Amino acid sequence: MEQAPGDQGPQREPYNEWALEILEELKNEAVRHFPRPWLHGLGQHIYNTYGDTWEGVEAIIRILQQLLFIHFRIGCRHSRIGIVPQRRVRNGASRS
């Protein structure tokens, strides 16, 4: 007969504490890369859509993660992560 696994180390922190910590980190990073009025509008949209619920917290975490990922991938000016724009040769001299 199957048995539940025994104690396997320290307890993980509760999901809601983890989610709030992640949200705080994402907010701190987002204000360094996006205009505050724009982020405020996003927060208002999430609040109007989800109210003050955990579903809203999850939604804003997901959206901020996606926005920051795309922002870094396109190439943030004050980050070394991202696509480095290549210079284009006008006359095509470097083509093989």
Curated annotation (Swiss-Prot):
GO cellular component terms given for this protein:
host cell; host cell nucleus; host extracellular space; virion component
Q: Look up keyword Transcription and say if it applies.
A: yes
Record PTM text: Phosphorylated on several residues by host. These phosphorylations regulate VPR activity for the nuclear import of the HIV-1 pre-integration complex.
Q: Where is this region: Homooligomerization?
A: 1-42
Q: Which HAMAP family match?
A: HIV_VPR
Query: What role is this protein assigned?
Result: During virus replication, may deplete host UNG protein, and incude G2-M cell cycle arrest. Acts by targeting specific host proteins for degradation by the 26S proteasome, through association with the cellular CUL4A-DDB1 E3 ligase complex by direct interaction with host VPRPB/DCAF-1. Cell cycle arrest reportedly occurs within hours of infection and is not blocked by antiviral agents, suggesting that it is initiated by the VPR carried into the virion. Additionally, VPR induces apoptosis in a cell cycle dependent manner suggesting that these two effects are mechanistically linked.
The extra comment attached to this record reads: HIV-1 lineages are divided in three main groups, M (for Major), O (for Outlier), and N (for New, or Non-M, Non-O). The vast majority of strains found worldwide belong to the group M. Group O seems to be endemic to and largely confined to Cameroon and neighboring countries in West Central Africa, where these viruses represent a small minority of HIV-1 strains. The group N is represented by a limited number of isolates from Cameroonian persons. The group M is further subdivided in 9 clades or subtypes (A to D, F to H, J and K).
Its protein name is Protein Vpr
